[in-house]
Amino acid sequence: MNNLNHIAFIMDGNGRWGLKKKNSRNYGHLEGVKTVQKMVETSIVFKIPIISFYVFSSENWKRPRSEINYLFNLIKIYFKKEINNITKNKIRINIIGRLNNLSKDIKKTLINTTRKTKKNKKLIVNLAINYGSKNEIIDSIKKLNHNSKTINEKNIEKNLYLNLPFPDILVRTGGYKRLSNFMLWQLAYTEIFFEKKLWPD
């Protein structure tokens, strides 16, 4: 475990878990937050410095509006409630994705959280929100000002959303064997594990 620098998770199966428990999809998302907390705590115990979670993809806007509203409200409430504990445990929060499509209050919450935790060094937690890997690569290339001489592997990597070591391991729960447009560039040499269990399990 100590040789690992970065573990990434595609947290699939929250909604299905909620329905399986004869409850709502939203209930599954709520329980999924508890699993995120467990993974964060485990990372601290085993001294894994970076952990990433695929929270909301750029394709998730196709979901029912009520579910989307619940998800973002859950994010907002969580950070307002837990920001002191996050700071106390020296956890740094990074947000990757396009924030321009998010509501003002959600955007404000996310930006404030990253600002308040930017000096913390015990654990880096990356949250992919309104994230799509294809968008990330496009955004990186745009920063190069369409200069063909500067468009190369090194410069594209330099302009990705975060300048951090790429994941050593990716775990996707929920049974599906696909990457769903998550960190396609960064996962080139990553070991990938597909888990049948749903995320809250």
Predicted regions and their residues:
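Flexible, compositionally biased loop and terminal segments
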Residues: 1-201
